[in-house]
Regions:
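N-terminal glycine/serine-rich phosphate-binding loop of ATP-dependent small-molecule kinases
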Residues: 1-85, 131, 138-160, 171-193, ...
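Conserved phosphate-binding loops in N-terminal lobes of ATP-dependent enzymes
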Residues: 9-12, 16-20, 28-31, 35-41, ...
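C-terminal, non-catalytic interaction/recognition modules in large multi-subunit enzymes and RNPs
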Residues: 12, 143-151, 282, 292, ...
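Glycine-rich phosphate-binding loop of actin/hexokinase-like ATP-binding domains
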Residues: 19, 30-39, 85-91, 111-114, ...
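Short, ordered loop/turn segments at secondary-structure junctions
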Residues: 24, 89-92, 165-167, 195-196, ...
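Glycine-rich beta-strand-to-loop/alpha-helix junction loops that act as flexible
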Residues: 69, 164-165, 193-195, 244-245, ...
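Terminal amphipathic helices with adjacent charged low-complexity linkers/tails
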Residues: 163-209, 554-556, 596-613, 678-686
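Charge-patterned, long linear interaction tracts outside catalytic cores
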Residues: 233-280, 518-558
Length: 689
């Protein structure tokens, strides 16, 4: 017993906090869900640790802890961050107010630009000026800087963001201003725009820096509280935090750069999904994560998550590399309601975990989870591993007014809500696939999250996906995915240059400088779990005159060879044609940013092998009356833990496990593959017809 050690993954969602514990010696997984404590998220984790204690886990044996969190995200969405000041180049005080002068909804003249996180009265002009190449036109005026700081102090603001024009080319004035403030006013938090991501486009760089300092106090406080409580519970280590790019960093880095954690939890789920893609021999996957609050998808192509170089959050651009994710609709807590025309709607309002759906016994609003229960998909005695008793009568009472207005029975109204939610998901998923140029028929649908496997078969049928893949622990995949993540750091150099004027020697020198910068980050981390490192080289490129770029990967080995830039030019033409269907061989090609990604690979998890089938016929543990698309069926009910390699379950069927429930539709069948995944296919495909 003395040699036992554990790895623990934690993910805090809007409704549940998930824990995934792996025994490093045996590969045995222990997974559980506990309600998220909205006002005190760390307490949800502590509640989960206490449940692990009750199962006989020695918390002092946890040697590796990874945490996906939404503290920064919630702080931004709820606009409960710090009161800040912004110092800008003289003449640019309106940068946060003007934004990009684009309506959020181009065809709606009433749509509003997001309210700046820093009001204009707290934006201070500073006399200084760099020109576009980074050379100094006007020196920084320290007296004016000092006067502005005095006003910040008099208004009792918590910190200052410094964002000067063209600082990405030369940060000298930003650094000079920060050093002055730190020396004379050490009580103030100060952040320069080039510290996080020195990329051109002034508005985007400024906004991201503002968001970082805006959410920083809440994230710092949370991490300090969490580390303290972990220590009190006997956990001997500090957590690593998942980043939006799918990588890990230590808690100290997360406290300094919390903007890198905004998409932390969902990104961990996609990383876990990428591992499933490899194990299931399904290189092309649509990940379908349905939790209590929302449904999100991501695309895995050739076993790798697709990445985005920027994201929009509450109308604010976040120009950091992140796993590309799209919110496509309702979650289990989405509220049922009728619009003015009497049409049934699902969401976007969610009941969350407090008070939760009506079937939790606390709330009064009908939600999607209540519909699942009424239609017979859920076992009221086994929800969340049996830790939460559902009340069907409460769900029916909540649905009764809706059913009356629709002139339907309660079951018909619940069934209709499920179909409305699926239709919403289908519409939005189809749009995403079309915009990215993907054919859903070439992809399988990977369902996870607490509610994903319940509706995945409906959605796969609608989009004509190859099949549905449900991993062994779908309800806690984000927590497990965090355990499989590597340490990742990205670095960027803004360099607007015509590719035809770029020599290979210059290109190599720039990438070598960036690689050193990214690699140095690893030496600053408290990391003891890296197996080896690898480097990816990327460039943002476009045809001259275009407004935005596409990502061009460069081979590290290719750079070492004696090649000229014309090989890069041809590679860009081919990439542009593949993504957009056309190319312009006569146009000049422009590089705007060079980027390097360094990956510190962590040791693989020692997963337990799947048991072979006994050869005995499968016997359902029970049967249940269910309601699907206005028809009644008698569904076979199975326990997921009794299904072994090669086992086949024909629909209609329900497969129950502690963290989720999977619904298999009529004319579909599920089988267990060699990695323990449940693969749901059309019966015709299963029999090779």
């Amino acid at each position: 017993m003395a040699d036992v050690s554990y790895r623990l993954g934690i993910d805090i969602g809007g409704t549940f906090t998930d824990l995934s514990l792996m025994n490093e010696a045996t590969g045995e997984l222990t997974e559980l869900k506990t309600p998220t404590v909205t006002d005190d998220p760390a307490q949800g984790i502590i509640n989960g640790l206490k449940l692990l204690k009750e199962r006989g886990v020695d918390l002092s044996k946890i040697q590796y802890l990874v945490h996906g969190m939404t503290i920064g995200l919630n702080t931004l969405l709820q606009r409960k961050g710090a009161d800040l000041a912004l110092f800008v180049t003289e003449g640019f005080q309106d940068i946060l107010s003007l934004q990009r002068l684009r309506l959020p909804i181009p065809y709606d003249f009433n749509s509003q630009l997001p309210e700046p996180l820093i009001p204009r009265k707290h934006v201070y002009p500073i006399s200084e000026r760099l020109i576009h190449d980074g050379s100094i036109k006007k020196p920084l005026q320290l007296q004016q800087l000092d006067d502005a700081v005095q006003q910040v102090i008099s208004k009792k603001l918590a910190g200052i963001v410094i964002s000067f024009l063209h600082s990405y080319q030369n940060p000298v004035h930003e650094l000079q201003a920060k050093a002055y403030i730190h020396h004379h006013y050490p009580q103030l938090e100060v952040l320069t725009s080039t510290e996080l991501w020195p990329q051109m486009r002034e508005y985007e760089r400024t906004v991201m820096s503002v968001v970082n300092l805006y959410i920083q106090p809440k994230v710092k406080q949370y991490l300090q509280t969490l580390k303290s409580r972990l220590k009190e519970e006997g956990v001997p280590i500090s957590p690593y935090i998942t980043q939006s790019n799918g990588g890990l960093m230590d808690a100290e880095s997360a406290a300094t750069s919390p903007v890198k954690t905004l998409f932390s939890g969902p990104a961990a789920g996609v990383i876990g999904a990428a591992r499933i893609a490899t194990s299931a021999n399904e290189p092309n996957l649509i990940t379908f994560d349905v939790g209590g609050t929302s449904a999100d998808i991501s695309i895995i192509q050739n076993g790798q998550p697709t990445m985005a170089q920027s994201n929009q959050l509450s109308g604010f651009p976040i120009i950091l590399p992140s796993v590309a994710m799209y919110s496509i609709g309702a979650g289990g807590g989405s509220v049922a309601w009728l619009d003015q025309g009497g049409l049934l709607k699902a969401g976007p309002e969610s009941v969350g975990s407090q008070p939760g759906p009506a079937s939790y016994g606390k709330g009064k609003k009908a939600a999607l989870t209540d519909a699942f229960l009424i239609c017979g998909y859920l076992n009221q005695d086994r929800f969340a591993g049996g830790h939460l008793q559902l009340q069907r009568s409460a769900a029916e009472i909540a649905f009764q007014p809706i059913a009356d207005q629709l002139h339907k029975t309660v079951e018909q109204a619940a069934d209709q809500l499920i179909q409305v939610a699926v239709a919403n998901m289908y519409t939005e998923l189809s749009n995403v696939m079309e915009q990215q140029g993907f054919d859903p028929r070439d992809f399988s649908l990977l369902a996870f999250g607490g509610a994903g496997p319940v509706v995945a078969n409906f959605l796969a049928r609608e989009i004509h996906a190859k099949n549905v893949v449900v991993p062994p622990s779908p309800g806690t995949l984000c927590a497990l995915g965090a355990l499989t993540a590597d340490f990742i750091h990205d670095a960027v150099l803004s360099k607007k240059i015509c590719l035809q004027d770029y020599t290979m020697d210059e290109l190599k020198q720039d990438y070598e400088m960036l690689s050193r910068k990214a690699t140095d980050w690893f030496s600053q981390q408290n990391i003891q779990h890296i197996k080896q490192t690898s480097i990816l080289l990327l460039a943002d490129a476009r045809y001259q005159g275009q407004a935005f770029e596409i990502e061009l990967p460069l081979s590290v080995d290719w750079l070492k060879q004696e090649q000229d830039v014309y090989h890069l030019i041809e590679a860009f033409h081919n990439l542009h044609e593949r993504q957009y269907g056309h190319r312009d061989d006569q146009a000049n090609i422009e590089f705007t940013h060079l980027r390097v990604r360094v990956i510190g690979e962590t040791p693989p998890l020692p997963f337990s092998p799947v048991d072979e089938s006994s050869g005995q016929p499968l016997i359902p543990q029970s049967y249940r009356r269910i309601f699907i698309e206005e028809k009644e069926y008698e569904a076979s009910v199975y326990n997921r833990s009794t299904l072994s390699l090669g086992a086949v379950v024909k629909g209609p069927a329900i497969i129950e496990q502690d963290d989720t429930t999977t619904l298999i539709l009529p004319k579909w069948a599920g089988s267990i593959d060699h990695s323990g995944n449940l693969v749901i296919s059309r019966e015709a495909a299963l029999h090779g017809n």
